[in-house]
C-alpha cells in the first residue's frame, strides 16, 4: 500500500506540481530583472526588444550578458534537480515500476514548463525571452554529453553564419535528435550509474523516447519564438553577432 501511495504521489509531483513551480521559476526572467534592478530600465524597450542574453550583451555589455546567460541556464537545472530530490528522497518512490516503466524519467517533464515560463513569464505580462539559454540548461540536465556537442555545434554555426538566432535554432534541432543515439545519450537522473548505462542499451532506448519528446516540444517552442528572426534572416535584416572581432558600426 505504501508503494502504491509513493507511485501515485510521484505521478502527481512530476505531472502536476513540478510543472507549476517550474513555470513560476522559469518566469523569473533574468534579463528583465537585471535591467530593472541595475539599470532602472526594461531591456524589452531596447534594440531587438528581446528579453535574453544576446540583447542584454548588445545593450549593456558582456558582463550582464554572461550573467543573464548563467541565470537562465540554471533555471531548468534547479527545477529538475528539485523534482528529482523530492522524488528520490522525500517520496522514496521506486524508480522502476512492476510494468517495467522507469518513472524517474518523468522528473524531466517540468523542464518544458521552465522554458514556457521563460518565454511567457506570468510576472512580466507574458512577454519574455526566446528560450535559448533555458533550453541549454534543460539539455545539460537531460544529457551532458549531447550538451557539450551542442555548445560546439552552436559556436561553429555562429562563426560561419554570424546569426545567433539561426545558430540556436539549428543547434536545438540537432541536439533534439542526438539524444536518440546510444553511447552519447547518457541521462543522469534516469541512468544513475554510467557503467550500467553502457551495458543496458535496451533500457536506455525505452527512456530516451520520453526525453526526446520533451526536447522536441522545447525545441519547437524555441523555434516558434524565433519566427520574427526567421523573417529577418530571409529579408537579410537580421542583426549579426561577432564573437572574436569588433562589431561593425553599421551593425549596431
Curated annotation (Swiss-Prot):
Enzyme class, spelled out: transferase
Subcellular location: Cell membrane
Gene Ontology biological-process annotations: phospholipid biosynthetic process
Topology of the protein relative to the lipid bilayer: Multi-pass membrane protein
EC number(s) stated in the UniProt entry for this protein: 2.3.1.275
Subunit: Probably interacts with PlsX.
Cross-referenced HAMAP family: PlsY
Protein name from the UniProt record: Glycerol-3-phosphate acyltransferase
Organism: Ureaplasma urealyticum serovar 10 (strain ATCC 33699 / Western)
Recorded name of the encoding gene: plsY
